[in-house]
Every structure is written in structure tokens, then in C-alpha cells.
């Protein structure tokens, strides 16, 4: 940006700000936009679960505890249980979005020594963010920890649904199975098989998402007003590029 506008004006581009003001506020925008996508996806999943719950309201199946036959239940009740869980996750995601929707342009160590708070307020309004009430040189990392913990819970709920389908699709049970498109191969060596590939992948992806929660929690503790230990986590990894 400085190179684009010319050498005379370039000295004003970064005036009063630190790199953290820019990077943290940009990260908030990214997470807010990601939240909007996730909220929309959860709403679509809720609609599908509700539809299946009503469709199979009277579809009887055997309930199990410890993996052993217990008492009769219905597929509708199973889908209703998943619906209730994802509805809680929708509320969690909305709360996490609100908590991460903050920006900070408070300068070195967060004192506004070289930047008017009115600038922070103006920029945050333009970006759809709320000024961080009390910042240091960074936006407090407990906000990010709560956000990624929420993603971990949602991933676990999706794995919960996927695991149920995987168990139901076993040959010995075969009470339900995931969608199998025309021409889809179950196995290169055993084409007669209909493997639960989608739900197995969801199970693996859930583990990956949960792995991001612990580093986010570790980042809550920083030295004084700022250190860069958190950048190892918040910066994109080569695998993300």
C-alpha cells in the first residue's frame, strides 16, 4: 500500500498503528465471515434433520445402550436428538461470532498515545466490528479461544451424527446408510461394498478441528502487553496455503 500511494504519503499509512492493529482486526473480519458461512450451513443441516425427524416419526428401530439391544425407539427420535444438539450449536456459533467481532487500533501497548480513539471507532464501524473495550497491543486471545472451542464442540456433534450412521450401516445392522450416488464405487478391490466414506471422513475431520482448540487455549497467556508466541498458531501454515 505504501509503495502504491507514493513516498511522500507513505509515512502516514502506518502512523500511530502497530502491525497487531492491522493483523488482529483483519483476523476478526476473517473469523466473522467464516462464522456467517458456518451459521448458514448449520441452518441448512437443521432443516434437513427436522425433515428426517418428521419423515421417520413412526419408523421403529431398536435402541441400544453399551452397544447392546435395549428398548424400541424410533428413527424420528434419533434425528430429533441430533436436531436439538445442532440447534444448541447454532446458538453457540452466534455467540462466538459476536465475541470475535471486535477490532483494535489502539497503537503500541494499547494506550492510544499516537492514535485518537475516534479513529478506532470510525474504522470498526466501517468494518462492522465493535472496538475492543480494553486492549493491550493485541485483541485478547480469550476471544479466539472461545471461538475455536465452539468449533471443536460443533465438530464433535457432527462426528456424533456420523458415528451413529456408520454403526447403523454395518452389514450386521444395516438400519440406515449414507447416500450412495449412481456409479459410485464402494471399494476398488471389492466393488460390491457400500462403504460409509463420507461419515468416516467427517470423523477424521472432526479430530483435526479439535486439534486446533488446545493451541487457541495456550495463546490466552501472553507476556505483558504482547508477545509473538501466538503467531505460530494464528499465522497460516504451509498446509493451509
Model segments located where?
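A structural signal for small-residue-enriched, beta-sheet-centric alpha/beta enzyme cores
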Residues: 134-135
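Short, surface-exposed loop/turn microsegments at beta-strand edges and helix-strand junctions
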Residues: 177-183
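Conserved small/polar residues in nucleotide/adenosyl-binding loops
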Residues: 233-240
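A helix-coil-helix interface module used to build multimeric assemblies
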Residues: 1-106, 112, 116-122, 131, ...
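A short secondary-structure junction motif
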Residues: 8, 52-59, 126-130, 168, ...
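A conserved active-site cap/scaffold subdomain adjacent to cofactor or substrate pockets
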Residues: 144-166, 184-232
Amino acid at each position: 500500500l505504501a509503495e502504491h500511494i507514493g513516498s511522500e504519503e507513505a509515512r502516514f499509512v502506518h502512523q500511530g498503528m502497530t502491525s497487531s492493529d492491522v493483523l488482529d482486526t483483519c483476523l476478526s473480519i476473517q473469523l466473522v465471515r467464516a462464522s456467517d458461512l458456518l451459521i448458514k450451513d448449520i441452518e441448512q443441516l437443521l432443516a434437513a434433520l427436522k425433515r428426517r425427524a418428521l419423515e421417520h416419526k413412526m419408523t421403529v428401530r431398536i435402541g441400544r445402550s453399551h452397544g447392546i439391544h435395549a428398548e424400541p425407539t424410533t428413527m424420528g427420535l434419533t434425528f430429533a436428538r441430533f436436531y436439538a444438539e445442532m440447534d444448541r450449536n447454532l446458538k453457540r456459533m452466534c455467540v462466538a461470532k459476536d465475541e470475535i467481532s471486535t477490532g483494535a487500533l489502539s497503537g503500541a501497548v494499547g494506550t492510544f498515545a499516537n492514535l485518537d480513539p475516534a479513529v478506532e471507532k470510525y474504522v470498526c464501524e466501517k468494518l462492522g466490528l465493535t472496538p475492543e473495550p480494553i486492549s493491550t497491543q493485541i485483541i485478547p486471545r480469550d476471544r479466539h479461544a472461545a471461538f475455536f472451542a465452539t468449533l471443536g464442540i460443533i465438530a464433535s456433534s457432527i462426528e456424533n451424527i456420523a458415528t451413529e450412521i456408520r454403526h447403523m450401516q454395518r452389514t450386521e445392522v444395516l438400519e440406515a446408510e449414507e447416500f450412495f450416488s449412481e456409479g459410485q464405487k464402494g471399494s476398488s478391490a471389492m466393488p460390491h461394498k457400500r462403504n460409509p466414506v463420507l461419515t468416516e471422513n467427517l470423523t477424521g475431520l472432526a479430530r483435526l478441528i479439535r486439534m486446533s482448540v488446545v493451541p487457541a487455549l495456550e495463546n490466552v497467556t501472553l507476556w505483558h502487553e504482547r508477545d509473538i508466541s501466538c503467531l505460530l498458531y494464528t499465522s497460516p501454515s504451509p498446509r493451509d496455503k
